[in-house]
Each structure stands twice: as structure tokens, then as C-alpha cells.
A protein has these predicted regions:
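C-terminal beta-signal and adjacent terminal beta-strands/loops
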Residues: 298-303, 561, 652, 709-718, ...
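Gram-negative outer-membrane beta-barrel transporters
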Residues: 608-612, 629-719, 759
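Transmembrane beta-barrel wall of Gram-negative outer-membrane proteins
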Residues: 268-297, 302, 306-350, 442, ...
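Short acidic/polar hinge/loop motifs at secondary-structure boundaries
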Residues: 77-78, 162, 197-225, 277
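A beta-strand signature from Gram-negative outer-membrane beta-barrel systems
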Residues: 215-256, 792
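Face-selective signature of the C-terminal outer-membrane beta-barrel domain
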Residues: 289, 329-345, 374-519, 544-546, ...
Length: 793
């Protein structure tokens, strides 16, 4: 029998010490693993494996959050060990949540696949109330263009006017020119913003505000439809807010490079090229994004290969965009950020315009030397300094902005006045915005938000001729406006909103002389300048009920305030004192009702609106130039939109918008009298239908096909000379097809191909038709391609 060894007391003591020490070490390691900190990293992609940048990733119940980078990569450090629930969200995709087991001193890799969101009601916007809110709580019509949608449309054309016309119901068709005259929103003027900085020049509307920045630096576009005063002067039909990209906080250094070529498929000298470069990252508390873009277009030709008239054309144009955004996080709740953007677009054409015959043959370009200054926007500078504090006191958060905008553009030669000449608009804006938001409960289960603050802006605008003559005098406007918005949610589903804004506007107008009508100053009127003071209290109210997905209704009433086109009134002055001119403001009352619906795979929405103003600003042609017709106006219309998921990889959708407007010339309250008129087509666009098809059934490939139909509008007769006045020419319907294909070659490498006017249709844009003149009877683009290659690193 085997004898077991006998342990001495000393040996037993050593074993006890050994096992005791091991147990302590093991317990310590286990405890540290449970209480230490680890890292979560990974990538955010869509169902095709395409990277999703700027997705918001946060650890629930922890004050930890970050944003995915351009390649979809992200990293969360100092995450407490144990089971942690992460939440990932971004506009356009369903929210994603997952429990992750975090181990101390270790990195957990998580790959996140987001499903494209079919309902827009979960989108979060900031432009409607100047605070984050979901569309399901917004009692108004809103269109949001996500980064993905911008990228798809940019693959066809980087012209923002084109992108928006295909994407926004109620917005007029693009002009295919440098400007956006006639591209109104719901039949009224739209206020365009870049990160809340006004781009529009309502004192002397120049029609250069939609194309005022390059889409490569835009993260998303928010379009608020219907009159609003939330951002101040000029939003009679609504507002368009370009929200610029954020710095990538997922890595210390990264970038995106893109190069491409463009051109027509018929005719020579059409090839152009485009380059853009972005660098971004985060180091400690500092983050940055720097971007540059250069584009040179070739000759633009129509479907028959004819050179499109260079008058305000986009052919042979050089465009530049420089963008910088720097941010510093003092604490997780305090941030200072500075943004600067430079945009310039100038035409250098070797062609002259040869007039067409209205209704018969197009105006085209012929070889020749153009005299005078090159047309285009010389510069558009925008700078914004923003400070945010998510808890400045109590539960109140603060956003404060100082901004600056400087704009200068030159127009083509005009013969509408004696001596002819080229005009230029200059506009400089300086402003401050202070916005506070305080949440609280007014009763059990009744949360409320108070949003309040102050806007201050100085706008100096003038219009001169390049030969030194003054057409519109310097107008120096100071706008001081406190505001208050309140929002309460009852029984979790009924949101009621209301607000007011007090407008205080003072405008100093210099003494000036109107342009002469003959030699030696004949016909010029010396007008004594002075001060114009405007004060108004404007309101908004609305309600939305979001309990049922199949029926989510809203109603709203909103006012806007606008000192619009004062410059046109001044330059057409027939009196020698300011007080004798019609300079009253435009106050618009907008009434709207609509609903959104989700039933299975179908999304559907509709809205009807009706807006009135006692004094409008319908532009009327007199002796070849515009004057403002100050008469009561009514504008009304409706919009419908539908999307349907046919298969997992196939969806279709579309929208239809129609608007009409009338003016009460004799001011008798009856808009259907013999003297009353339809508002011309510079204001009221023809009906517009768009249909899209999206297919992603082939690995790494997405395909988008778009169809647009611009309808008829024929409301006016010719004058005694048998000609149409500007804005009154009949518009005949036309149809266009575009297609975009994006192929993810590798994870960092992407190939994009877009074709505009796929069927090479001969057509005249709406502006070419309603202008009713030989020189403006210009065809739209023939079949054009846009081929680009992008690389993320």
C-alpha cells in the first residue's frame, strides 16, 4: 500500500500562504476586470457595406459618445468594464442598440450594420425651432436631405439648385444658370442659410443664394416650408438651411479625396474636371475639418450639340470652395467652434450670345470676345463663431453665435436703362444670435420646452454699375429681434407649439440719384435719403398628434416679416423724398394642414396650404425692367409624397406639388374681379412631379433612377405688340430622366457615375419659357455625364 507523505506544520503553512495569495490575486484581477475601463471600436456601415460617416454612437447611462468618421470607423475609450448598452443613430437609418461586454484594458471590436430608415418622422432637425426636435413633433412640412441623398444627387450634378429641385416638393425647377430667379418655394421667396447665416439679400434680391456653397461640405439640408420668422427677415415661403459637416472624431487624422470629369456626350470642348480634398480628425479636446474644392466646366451643349447661350450660363465656369471648421471641447458639455467658408464662381467664356426666336429657335453661343467683366460671384465669405453650453444653469442650455457674411456678384450687361451696363450687388452682414432652451414639466407626463433668445443683425446692401454709376443706394439695416418659442407634449403624443418674435428694423438710406434716362443726366431724380423704421409682432402656432403611425396629422399657422426688394422700389423712384415711396413691409399669414402615414411598407404624406399678404411684391415688367407691384396676394397649393418598399433591395417613390397665386389689383377683397391678375411665373412655378427608383440588389452597387415632369402653366396673353411680358410666357411641360450608380470598389475606394438628361431630351427650362424673350430662350443641357472616384483614408 502506497503511503502518503506526511506534511509538516511548516509545509502546511507554506501551502496555505500560497493558495491564499493566489486567491487574493485572482479576486483582485476579477474585481479589476469588472471595475476597470476598456475600449469599444468598430465600423458603421449600411446593408451594402458602404461606410456611414457622422453616425452618433453613445454608451447609454454613461456620459460617453462619439461620431463615426468618413470611413465609418469609431472609437469609445474609458468605457467602464461590464455589460454596456450602446446606441447608434443617424438621420435616414433605423436606430441600433446592442449590449457589449467590455473588459478592462482591452478593446472590443463591434461591427454595426444600420438599416435604411423608411419613415422620416424619426429624423431630428434643428431649423424649425432652433433646437433639436423630431419631425414627429413638428407641426409643419419639412424636407430633410441626408448626406447619403446629397451624395447620390451630387453624382449626377453638383449644382445645388438642381439637387434641391429634384428633392424638395414645392420648390421651383432649377434655371440651369448661375442664379435661381423664379425658383421660389411655394410661390414665395425663400431665405437661404449656411449654419444659420443668411445668404439671401432681401433688401435687393440677387438670386444667387441657393448656389452659395459647394455640396461637398454639407452634411444635410433642412427645408422648412411655409412662412416663418424663426430666423428673421425674408422667409415668406420658408427657409433652406445648409448644415455643414462636422469634424470626424473617430480618429486623429483622416481624409477623403475625390477626382472626377464631366461633359456632354455630344459635341466637342465639353470636358471639365473637379477635385476635392478633405482632412479631418480629433486630437485630445481639439477637432478639425479642412476642405478644398476646385471645378472647371467645359462648354455646355443642348441635346442637338448646340452651344448653350453663355448668358448667366454654367459652362466654362471656374468654381472654388474652401472650408474650415475647428472645435474645442472645454468639458463634455462646453464647446467652442469656428467655421469659415469661401465660395467663388466665375465664367470665362469664349462665346457670345446669339439671340433666338422665342417659341421657335433657341438662343445659342457663337465664337466671339465678350466685353466687360466676367459674370459670376466674385466671393461669398461666411464665418461663424459658436459657443455651446449644455447646462449653463439648471437644465438650461445655451447656444451663442457671432457671424459674418460678405458677398459680391457681377451680372451680365443690361440694356434696360440708358447707356446700358453691368450691375453688381454687394452685401455685408454682421450678426449675433443668443439662443437658450429650458426644459421642464408643467404637470405629470406633460414635458415642456421653452426656447428663447435674441437676434441682432446689421445688413449693408447696395447695387452699383461696374462703370461707377449707382443704381441702388447703400441701405444700412439694423435688425433687433427677441423671440420666444414654447412646446408642450400632452399624453405623450400631442405636441402643441407656439411662439412670437418682435421685429425692430431700422434702415438708413443714403441720398442718391436715379439713373438718367437720357444724355447729360436727363431724367435723373435726386432722392433725399433718410430713415425707415419697421416694428412688428409675428406669431406662430401649431399642433401635431403622433399616436398612430397610420395617421399623424398636423395643423399650423405662421407669419413671416420681410422688407423685401426695397432696392427695386428705390431705383424706380419717381419722387424726390423717401417718405413718398411705397416701402411698407410684407407680412405673410400661412395656414397649413397635413398628415403623415406609415402602413406596412408604404409611407405617405400630404399637405395643403393657403397664404395671404396685404402687400405683396409681385414683379412686373415696365420698359424692360422689373418693378414691385404692391397689391394684396393669395397663394395656395398642395403637396403629396409616397414611398414604397417593393422588395428588400428595391424601393420606389415620388411626389407631386402644385401651387397657384392671385393678386387683388383693385384691393376690393375679391381676387376674381376683372382687374385682378394671376401672379406671374417668376413667382408661381408650374406643377412638378418626381418619381424615383432605388435598387441595391447587386453587391456593393446602388442604382438610383429619377424622373421629373414639369407641368404646363398658361395664364397670360400677349401685349399690344404681340409679345409676352417678362414672367408671363406660357410654360409647356417637359420630362427628364437622370440616373446615378455608385460602386464600392473596396472599403476605401468608391466609383460614382451619373447621367443627367439620360434620354437626351430637347427641352427649354421653365425660366427660358416664361421670360418670353429672344435672348433668354435658352435650351437645357443635353445628355451629360459625371464620373468620379473617391478614396477615404
Amino acid at each position: 500500500m502506497l503511503a502518503l507523505p506526511k506534511f509538516s506544520y511548516c509545509m502546511k503553512h507554506h501551502y496555505i500562504k500560497f493558495f491564499g495569495t493566489a486567491l487574493i490575486i485572482l479576486s483582485t484581477v476579477t474585481l479589476f476586470a469588472q471595475t476597470g475601463k476598456g475600449t469599444i471600436s468598430g465600423n458603421v456601415v449600411d446593408s451594402l457595406g458602404n461606410s456611414i460617416p457622422f453616425a452618433n454612437i453613445q454608451v447609454k447611462k454613461q456620459n460617453l459618445k462619439t461620431t463615426s468618421g468618413k470611413t465609418g470607423a469609431f472609437k469609445l475609450t474609458d468605457v467602464p468594464a461590464g455589460n454596456q448598452q450602446i446606441k447608434v443613430s443617424i438621420t435616414g437609418y433605423d436606430q441600433f442598440e446592442q449590449v457589449v461586454s467590455v473588459i478592462a484594458n482591452d478593446t472590443i471590436q463591434v461591427n454595426i450594420v444600420l438599416k435604411e430608415q423608411r419613415s422620416e418622422l424619426n429624423d431630428v432637425i434643428v431649423s424649425a425651432s432652433r433646437r433639436p426636435e423630431s419631425l414627429s413633433q413638428t407641426p409643419s412640412s419639412v424636407t430633410v436631405l441626408t448626406a447619403k441623398e446629397l451624395n447620390t444627387q451630387s453624382a449626377i450634378s453638383p449644382n445645388l439648385a438642381n439637387i434641391l429641385s429634384y428633392s424638395v416638393p414645392g420648390l421651383g425647377f432649377s434655371t440651369n444658370q448661375t442664379g435661381n430667379s423664379g425658383q421660389t418655394l411655394r410661390g414665395r421667396n425663400v431665405l437661404v442659410l449656411i449654419d444659420g447665416i443668411p445668404q439671401s439679400t432681401p433688401l435687393r434680391a440677387g438670386g444667387r443664394d441657393i448656389r452659395s456653397i459647394d455640396p461637398s461640405v454639407i452634411e444635410r439640408v433642412e427645408v422648412i416650408k411655409g412662412a416663418t420668422a424663426i430666423y428673421g427677415n425674408g422667409a415668406e415661403g420658408g427657409l433652406i438651411n445648409y448644415i455643414t459637416k462636422k469634424a470626424d472624431k473617430g480618429k486623429s487624422f483622416g481624409g477623403y479625396s475625390q477626382a472626377g470629369i464631366t461633359g456632354n456626350l455630344k459635341g466637342d470642348s465639353t470636358i471639365g474636371y473637379r477635385f476635392s480634398q478633405q482632412l479631418y480628425g480629433k486630437t485630445g479636446k481639439f477637432d478639425y475639418l479642412v476642405s478644398g474644392m476646385f471645378e472647371k466646366t467645359g462648354v455646355f451643349r443642348d441635346a442637338e450639340g448646340l452651344v448653350i447661350s453663355p448668358e448667366y450660363g454654367l459652362g466654362e465656369t471656374k468654381s472654388y470652395n474652401g472650408f474650415v471648421k475647428l472645435g474645442y471641447n472645454f468639458t463634455p458639455k462646453q464647446r467652442l467652434q469656428v467655421m469659415y467658408n469661401y465660395f467663388s464662381s466665375r465664367q470665362h467664356s469664349k462665346y457670345l450670345t446669339k439671340e433666338g426666336v422665342y417659341g421657335q429657335s433657341p438662343a445659342i453661343g457663337i465664337y466671339g470676345k465678350r466685353l466687360g467683366e466676367d459674370e459670376g460671384t466674385r466671393f461669398n465669405h461666411n464665418a461663424n463663431l459658436q459657443y455651446t453650453n449644455q447646462q449653463i444653469f439648471g437644465k438650461t442650455d445655451l447656444t451663442a453665435n457671432l457671424y459674418y457674411q460678405d458677398f459680391y456678384t457681377i451680372y451680365s450687361n443690361s440694356a434696360s436703362f440708358f447707356g446700358s451696363g453691368q450691375s453688381a450687388i454687394t452685401s455685408t452682414k454682421k450678426g449675433a444670435r443668443v439662443n437658450l432652451n429650458t426644459p421642464f414639466n408643467i404637470a405629470d407626463q406633460v414635458p415642456m420646452q421653452l426656447n428663447y433668445g435674441l437676434d441682432l443683425m446689421n445688413d449693408k446692401t447696395a447695387q452699383s454699375l461696374t462703370d461707377g454709376r449707382l443704381w441702388v443706394p447703400n441701405m444700412n439695416m439694423v435688425n433687433f429681434a427677441p423671440y420666444l418659442q414654447a412646446s408642450a407634449t400632452f399624453i405623450n403624443d400631442l405636441t402643441i407649439k407656439g411662439g412670437l418674435r418682435v421685429e425692430n428694423i431700422n434702415i438708413d438710406v443714403d441720398d442718391f440719384n436715379t439713373l438718367a434716362t437720357g444724355a447729360n443726366g436727363a431724367g435723373s431724380i435726386a432722392v433725399q435719403g433718410g430713415k425707415l423704421n419697421y416694428n412688428a409682432l409675428v406669431f406662430n402656432a401649431g399642433a401635431r398628434y403622433s399616436k398612430f403611425k397610420f395617421f399623424n396629422p398636423f395643423i399650423s399657422y405662421a407669419q413671416s416679416f420681410s422688407v423685401f426688394e426695397l432696392g427695386r422700389v428705390l431705383r424706380a423712384a419717381k419722387s424726390n423724398t423717401l417718405s413718398q415711396l411705397e416701402t411698407k413691409p410684407i407680412i405673410v399669414n400661412n395656414y397649413e394642414a397635413g398628415f403623415s402615414s406609415t402602413v406596412g411598407k408604404l409611407n405617405f404624406s400630404a399637405a395643403y396650404y393657403y397664404s395671404t399678404s396685404k402687400l405683396g411684391a409681385n414683379l412686373l415688367e415696365v420698359n424692360g425692367t422689373y418693378i414691385s407691384q404692391r397689391i394684396p396676394e393669395r397663394v395656395y397649393g398642395f403637396e403629396i409624397q409616397a414611398d414604397y418598399q417593393v422588395l428588400r433591395d428595391l424601393s420606389i417613390g415620388g411626389n407631386y406639388a402644385q401651387v397657384e397665386g392671385k393678386g387683388d389689383v383693385d384691393d376690393d377683397g375679391n381676387f376674381n374681379g376683372e382687374k385682378d391678375v394671376y401672379l406671374n411665373t417668376t413667382r408661381i412655378p408650374p406643377s412638378k412631379t418626381t418619381v424615383y427608383l432605388k435598387y441595391s440588389g447587386i453587391k456593393n452597387l446602388s442604382l438610383d433612377v429619377n424622373w421629373m415632369r414639369v407641368g404646363n402653366r398658361d395664364r397670360f396673353k400677349t401685349n399690344a405688340a404681340g409679345k409676352y411680358l417678362i414672367g408671363e410666357g406660357p410654360v409647356k411641360a417637359f420630362n427628364l430622366f437622370n440616373v446615378a450608380a455608385v460602386y464600392q470598389v473596396t472599403q476605401p475606394l468608391k466609383l460614382s457615375v451619373g447621367v443627367e438628361n439620360l434620354l437626351n431630351k430637347v427641352y427649354y427650362p421653365a425660366i427660358s419659357q416664361f421670360y418670353g424673350s429672344n435672348v433668354n430662350y435658352v435650351r437645357g443641357n443635353g445628355r451629360r455625364f459625371n464620373l468620379s472616384l473617391g478614396y477615404a483614408f
